A protein has these predicted regions:
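A short, structured active-site edge motif that brings together acidic residues
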Residues: 98-104
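Histidine-acidic metal/acid-base catalytic patches
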Residues: 4-19, 25-38, 44-56, 60-62, ...
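Acidic-and-aromatic substrate-binding clefts and catalytic sites of carbohydrate-active enzymes
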Residues: 44-50, 70-81, 104-115, 139-148, ...
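Acidic (Asp/Glu)-rich catalytic clusters
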Residues: 31-32, 56-61, 78-97, 117-129, ...
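N-terminal substrate-binding region of glycoside hydrolase catalytic domains
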Residues: 64-78, 100, 134
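Active-site acidic/histidine proton-transfer and metal-coordination neighborhood
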Residues: 10-12, 21, 107-200, 276
Length: 294
């Protein structure tokens, strides 16, 4: 932490100036960025309201080739129509991989009106030429029976999404590494959902925070975890940090990337201090790994 703060304070001005200086190049190039590293735009949630297009340009100039959205339940993203966001990012050389969203447990009958939510979300995902609708967080499970109902619900969500042209995934936080009646929540959900309909987006930092072994999950559940959130957690100091400075074993994870079926890699920067500089550092850390090359 002290070392990072020292570096960030001494280099922040130069780094951000360099990013800003690349804005013009990013704005006039419609060619896709090289590589396979995306950014969860939740990472820059404080910057987007201040300068939406300018922030996206800075992200593109860092080298990111894709973005993940969030809070599009009303058909827009920070007040911008989704079609406009899609075009804006495409002009910056970036695609959209999917969005975070979510609902509580809905009626078993997928023709019930409550299921219009997931049909609408699927339409929004298609509107931005993306593939994934991702639920982040589980509704108040307190027993194994609750987990059983939740698993059945996720199966139905996956079916509805698939019928509407997108795929469904569940994103874990550290809480899902806890146990209910002796069952690790995340493992129960993976084992008791249908692999045809339900996939998982593993947040690496949250998994380590919860005491989980990311590499074990990739080995034991191949093809079930095609999406990664690249975040980092310093287990010794109990805090989220920049990629490569924490306890997530990324070299070992990327050794398993192909065999585990990794499809989508998005950085999620959990810290809010020097966010743009952190996102640039995260990109530079990940680009050393062979999988990230186009």
């Amino acid at each position: 932490m002290n070392r990072r703060q020292f570096i960030s304070k001494s280099a922040a001005a130069l780094t951000l100036a360099g990013i800003a200086g690349q804005d013009a190049m990013a704005s006039i190039s419609a060619k896709p960025n090289r590589g396979r590293i995306g950014l969860v735009l939740y990472s820059v949630r404080n910057e987007l309201p201040k300068d939406f297009e300018g922030t996206l340009k800075k992200v593109s100039a860092m080298g990111y080739s894709a973005a993940e959205l969030f809070k599009i339940n009303d058909g827009d993203f920070f007040g911008h129509p989704l079609k406009e966001v899609r075009v804006m990012l495409k002009d910056l050389g970036m695609s959209i991989t999917g969005t975070h969203t979510g609902s509580g447990v809905l009626p078993e009958d997928i023709n019930a009106p409550e299921w219009d939510f997931w049909k609408k979300i699927s339409e929004y995902v298609r509107t931005v030429d993306a593939k994934w609708a991702i639920q982040a967080g589980f509704p108040g499970a307190k027993s194994v029976d609750d987990l059983k109902r939740l698993s059945a619900h996720f199966n139905r969500v996956g079916q509805v999404c698939q019928k509407n042209g997108v795929k469904f995934a569940y994103h874990n936080h550290h809480a899902e590494l806890g146990k209910i009646e002796g069952e690790v929540i995340l493992e129960y959900l993976i084992k008791n959902t249908d692999p045809k309909y339900v996939f998982f987006q593993m947040d690496m930092g949250h998994t380590v925070n919860g005491g989980g072994d990311c590499t074990r999950y990739l080995r034991e559940f191949p093809k079930r975890i095609p999406l990664w959130h690249a975040s980092d957690f310093d287990a010794a100091n109990r805090k989220y940090t920049w990629l490569g400075k924490g306890s997530v074993p990324y070299p070992a994870l990327f050794d398993l990337a192909k065999s585990s079926g990794l499809e989508v890699l998005n950085v999620e920067q959990e810290t809010l201090e020097n966010t743009l500089e952190a996102c640039k550092s995260d990109f530079n850390y990940l680009k050393q790994f062979k999988w990230t090359k186009a």
